[in-house]
Amino acid sequence: MSKQEKAISLSESAQVDQQSVQPLPNSRKVYVEGSRPDIRVPMREISLHDTPTDFGGEKNAPVLVYDTSGPYTDPNVVIDVRKGLGDVRSAWIDARGDTERLEGLSSNFGLQRLNDAELAKLRFAHVRNPRRAKAGANVSQMHYARQGIITAEMEYVAIRENMKLQEARAAGLLDQQHAGHSFGASIPKEITPEFVREEIARGRAIIPANINHTELEPMIIGRNFLVKINGNIGNSALGSSIEEEVAKLTWGIRWGSDTVMDLSTGKHIHETREWIIRNSPVPIGTVPIYQALEKVNGVAEDLTWELFRDTLIEQAEQGVDYFTIHAGVLLRYVPLTAKRVTGIVSRGGSIMAKWCLAHHKENFLYTHFDEICEIMKAYDVSFSLGDGLRPGSIADANDAAQFGELETLGELTKIAWKHDVQCMIEGPGHVPMQLIKENMDKQLECCDEAPFYTLGPLTTDIAPGYDHITSGIGAAMIGWFGCAMLCYVTPKEHLGLPNKDDVKTGIITYKIAAHAADLAKGHPGAQIRDNALSKARFEFRWEDQFNLGLDPDTARSFHDETLPKESAKVAHFCSMCGPKFCSMKITQEVREYAAKIETVDVTVEQGMREQSERFRQEGSQLYQKV
C-alpha cells in the first residue's frame, strides 16, 4: 500500500473481497420465512441437471445446503464493508423490552480509543452506542429458555437446522440414510423450536448472540445439532492489516465457517474487531486476556482484575458473542505441567500460569468468576471456558493437569448456569486416537453435557505442514463421539500465520470432518447431499458433481487438468480409468443387459404359466390321446 493510500481513511477506501461475493456455481440464496416476516433464514439451493435419457431421464430436485456466507453471496444485496451488514435482530431485541441503549461507551479503554484523533483513519465510521440489559434484567438466551420463552433466535435456528427436511423426504432425496450411532445423544427426527428451547434451558446447547451484534444470523452449538466448525483469524505483531482480516472473515464464511474467532495480538486490536463484527453474519469469539496483555505491554505480572473487567465490557459493547476465559488454570495445577514434554502451550493458559506464580495467588479469573457472569448476562455473551492446560503433544494427552482443569471447568459451568449464562467447554489439543473417546466421556461427565469445543485434536505430531489432516482425523472422531464444535487447524499450524488459501484448506478439511460426524451420529437429513452427489457421479453429471461438493472450484480444476475440453464434462468416463475401464460405465452396461435378460425371462415365464394352465384344464394327464 502506498503512502498516499495510507493517508486515505479506511472508512473511505475499504472494499469487500471480490472473491467472497460471487455466488457459488449453479446456486442461489433462498430464504425460509418463520412465524413472522422478519424471520428469514438463509439457505443455499443447488440446482441440478436432469438425468440423461441413457439413465432413465428424470428431473432431479434441487438440494438445499446449510449456508454460513451471509448476504455476501446474495446478488440482490449491495455489500459495502464501510457501512457493515444490514440489521437482522434489533426488532427482536426491542420487542423483549429488557435492554436499554447507553448514551455512550462505558469502557475506559473504548472511550480512549474513540477520542484518539490519530485513530480516525482506521476507525469504522458507524460506531453505535451499545445496548445493555436494564438494571436487574438477564438477557441471555438461556434465561429466556428457562422462562419457557421461545425467542425469535430459537425459531430461526430450528428452521436453519431442519433444512426443510420434510420437503427433501417428499422429493426422494432421503430414500437412503444409514442408521447412526450417537453414543447416547438425544437427536430427534426433526428439530423444532421447542426442542431448541429445551436444549438451551438444559445447558446442552448455546446460541452465541450478543445483543450488540445485530447483524448476526443466529446459529446453535450442541451435541444434538449439526456439528459446527470455527475458523480463526487475527493479526499479530509480525503482520496483517485490518483489511486482510476482514477479507479472511468473508473468505472463511464463504467456505463454511460457522463461527470466527478474532485472535488478534498486534496493533489496533480494538479497531480491527469493530470492523470484523460489523461485517460478520456469524458469531465472533475472542480471548480477552490477549488484549488485556497488550494493555500492560506484554508483562503478565502486571495484569489486574480491574483492567480485565474493563476489557470484557469493551468487547461486550462491541458485540463479541463468546469469550474464551481461562478460569480453570488454578495455582495447584501449574506444577503438574512441569514434567510434560511440551509444558503449557495455550497462550491464555501460560499468561494466567505466569500471573499465578508471580503473585502466588489464585487465578483472578477464577476468584472473580461470579462478577464475570454478571457482565456476560448483561450482554448475552457466552462462555467458552478455555482449556489453558491442554496437551501440546500426544505424549502429554489425558494427564493430571489436563483432567484436573477439566473438572474445574465443570464446577465453573454450574456457576455460570446458576446465573443463566450460556456456556461451552474448550478441549484439546494433541490426543492419539485411542485416547479421544476418554476425553469426550470425561467432558460429558464433568460438565453435564455442556457443548464441547475442541482444537482438532491432532492425532500425531509427525506432520508439520499437514496438521489440518492430522487434526481432521481426530476432529471427525470426537465429533462423532459428541463434540459440538470443531476449531479448524490450517496447514500452517505450528509454522506461521495462515493466508487465505490456508484458511480455505482448513475450513474444507473441517467441514469434511463435521459432516462425517453428522453422518455417523445419524443426524436427520445428513445424507441428502451424499445421495445426490453419488447419483450425479453414477450418471456422469460432471457439473452437478462439482457443484454439490464442498469445494466446486477445486473439483472442477482437478477434472480439467487432464480433460480440459467442455465435451469431457458430458463424457461417460473420467481420466482415472478412461472410456474402456470405467467401473460406472461398465455397471450401467451390466444393468442394461440385465434389463434385457429380465424381459426375456418374463416372456418365458408367462409362456410357462399358460402351458401349465392348459395342462390342468386337460385333466392333468401326463399322456394325451392324439
UniProtKB/Swiss-Prot annotation:
<feature type="region of interest" description="Disordered">
    <location>
        <begin position="1"/>
        <end position="27"/>
    </location>
</feature>
<feature type="binding site">
    <location>
        <position position="326"/>
    </location>
    <ligand>
        <name>substrate</name>
    </ligand>
</feature>
<comment type="subunit">
    <text>Homodimer.</text>
</comment>
<dbReference type="GO" id="GO:0008270">
    <property type="term" value="F:zinc ion binding"/>
</dbReference>
<dbReference type="GO" id="GO:0009228">
    <property type="term" value="P:thiamine biosynthetic process"/>
</dbReference>
<feature type="binding site">
    <location>
        <begin position="346"/>
        <end position="348"/>
    </location>
    <ligand>
        <name>substrate</name>
    </ligand>
</feature>
<dbReference type="GO" id="GO:0051539">
    <property type="term" value="F:4 iron, 4 sulfur cluster binding"/>
</dbReference>
<feature type="binding site">
    <location>
        <position position="290"/>
    </location>
    <ligand>
        <name>substrate</name>
    </ligand>
</feature>
<dbReference type="GO" id="GO:0009229">
    <property type="term" value="P:thiamine diphosphate biosynthetic process"/>
</dbReference>
<dbReference type="Pfam" id="PF01964">
    <property type="entry name" value="ThiC_Rad_SAM"/>
</dbReference>
<dbReference type="Pfam" id="PF13667">
    <property type="entry name" value="ThiC-associated"/>
</dbReference>
<keyword id="KW-0408">Iron</keyword>
<feature type="binding site">
    <location>
        <position position="494"/>
    </location>
    <ligand>
        <name>Zn(2+)</name>
    </ligand>
</feature>
<protein>
    <recommendedName>
        <fullName>Phosphomethylpyrimidine synthase</fullName>
        <ecNumber>4.1.99.17</ecNumber>
    </recommendedName>
</protein>
<dbReference type="InterPro" id="IPR038521">
    <property type="entry name" value="ThiC/Bza_core_dom"/>
</dbReference>
<dbReference type="InterPro" id="IPR025747">
    <property type="entry name" value="ThiC-associated_dom"/>
</dbReference>
<feature type="binding site">
    <location>
        <begin position="387"/>
        <end position="390"/>
    </location>
    <ligand>
        <name>substrate</name>
    </ligand>
</feature>
<keyword id="KW-0862">Zinc</keyword>
<keyword id="KW-0784">Thiamine biosynthesis</keyword>
<dbReference type="GO" id="GO:0016830">
    <property type="term" value="F:carbon-carbon lyase activity"/>
</dbReference>
<keyword id="KW-0479">Metal-binding</keyword>
<feature type="binding site">
    <location>
        <position position="453"/>
    </location>
    <ligand>
        <name>substrate</name>
    </ligand>
</feature>
<comment type="pathway">
    <text>Cofactor biosynthesis; thiamine diphosphate biosynthesis.</text>
</comment>
<keyword id="KW-0411">Iron-sulfur</keyword>
<feature type="compositionally biased region" description="Polar residues">
    <location>
        <begin position="10"/>
        <end position="25"/>
    </location>
</feature>
<feature type="binding site">
    <location>
        <position position="232"/>
    </location>
    <ligand>
        <name>substrate</name>
    </ligand>
</feature>
<feature type="binding site">
    <location>
        <position position="430"/>
    </location>
    <ligand>
        <name>Zn(2+)</name>
    </ligand>
</feature>
<keyword id="KW-0004">4Fe-4S</keyword>
<dbReference type="GO" id="GO:0005829">
    <property type="term" value="C:cytosol"/>
</dbReference>
<keyword id="KW-0949">S-adenosyl-L-methionine</keyword>
<dbReference type="InterPro" id="IPR037509">
    <property type="entry name" value="ThiC"/>
</dbReference>
<feature type="binding site">
    <location>
        <position position="261"/>
    </location>
    <ligand>
        <name>substrate</name>
    </ligand>
</feature>
<dbReference type="InterPro" id="IPR002817">
    <property type="entry name" value="ThiC/BzaA/B"/>
</dbReference>
<feature type="binding site">
    <location>
        <position position="577"/>
    </location>
    <ligand>
        <name>[4Fe-4S] cluster</name>
    </ligand>
</feature>
<feature type="binding site">
    <location>
        <position position="574"/>
    </location>
    <ligand>
        <name>[4Fe-4S] cluster</name>
    </ligand>
</feature>
<comment type="similarity">
    <text>Belongs to the ThiC family.</text>
</comment>
<feature type="binding site">
    <location>
        <position position="582"/>
    </location>
    <ligand>
        <name>[4Fe-4S] cluster</name>
    </ligand>
</feature>
<comment type="function">
    <text>Catalyzes the synthesis of the hydroxymethylpyrimidine phosphate (HMP-P) moiety of thiamine from aminoimidazole ribotide (AIR) in a radical S-adenosyl-L-methionine (SAM)-dependent reaction.</text>
</comment>
<keyword id="KW-0456">Lyase</keyword>
<feature type="binding site">
    <location>
        <position position="426"/>
    </location>
    <ligand>
        <name>substrate</name>
    </ligand>
</feature>
